[in-house]
Amino acid sequence: MDKRHTEGQICETILVEYLLRLDLYVFQPVSAHGPVDVIALSAEGEMYLFDAKKNAERYVPERGTNHRIHRVLSPLQKTLGVRMAYVDIATRDVHIVPALPELKK
């Protein structure tokens, strides 16, 4: 399997674990190709759609630091309200854009 596909699957798996730890109900679409990688539902009935991406950074000389490379949502993803989930495979950190609201526990 292509390394990028493998890393994509790892990112989705880490995202699923992250969302489960937030006490969300988590689902994955059957289709391998589509605008959404992961669907999550809160106990209050709120639905969240995610596109999982491997976190990538670029060095910005003017700032002297690395900065996340933000991916662009497709027009369909924008219409659906998909959130981008950047996953760091090495640290298992997940950064969601736009951020999730404070979830009740």
Description of each model-found segment:
Residues D23, E46, T79-G81:
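A generic structural signal for alpha->beta connector loops
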Residues L15, L19, V38-A40, E44-R58:
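Conserved catalytic cores of phosphodiester-cleaving nucleases, focusing on short active-site segments
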Residues Q28-V30, P61-E62:
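Short histidine-centered beta-strand/loop micro-motifs
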Residues N55-R83:
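Short, charged, amphipathic alpha-helix that recurs within catalytic cores of restriction-modification
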Residues K78-K105:
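Domain-level recognition of nuclease-like catalytic cores that cleave nucleotide substrates
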Residues M1-P29:
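Acidic-basic catalytic patches of nuclease active cores, encompassing PD-(D/E)XK
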Residues A32-P35:
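Short acidic/glycine-enriched loop/turn segments that link adjacent beta-strands
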